[in-house]
Amino acid sequence: MPNTNSNSYTFAYAAVLTLIVAVALAAAATGLKPIQQQAIDLDKKRSILNAVTNLTDKQQILKDYAEKVTEVVIDQQGNAVEGVKAFDLVLKKAYKKSDSERRLPLYIYNAPEGKKYIVPMHGAGLWDEIWGYIALDQD
């Protein structure tokens, strides 16, 4: 039986316990990554749809987004850009690029009463950053 009152036993015990907890945390973080990404995507879709509707049900949000929202990426002149997914663009990073390289997402909501254009907004507020989505009716 080892001497549990020795310094070497205490350090070895702490090292083994730290290693076990580190492996458990790494496994949990890796295992939960897909679930976290799904939650982030759902929150973004909910935010986009909240500009035009007031949906709270997860299944209804996913259904409406898939059926009624068209994603478009535009350049500074308003021309559609192919090969880039609007949902994956990070607006904060896009604003830091030069005008010629800047690509911006635009979401088109196809409602029964007509199209609505959903534009993401991002900027500086009084205390922190302000971000959200603004919906515009088709004129």
Task: Cite the ranges covered by each PLM segment.
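Flexible, solvent-exposed loop/hinge segments and secondary-structure transition points
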Residues: P2-D139
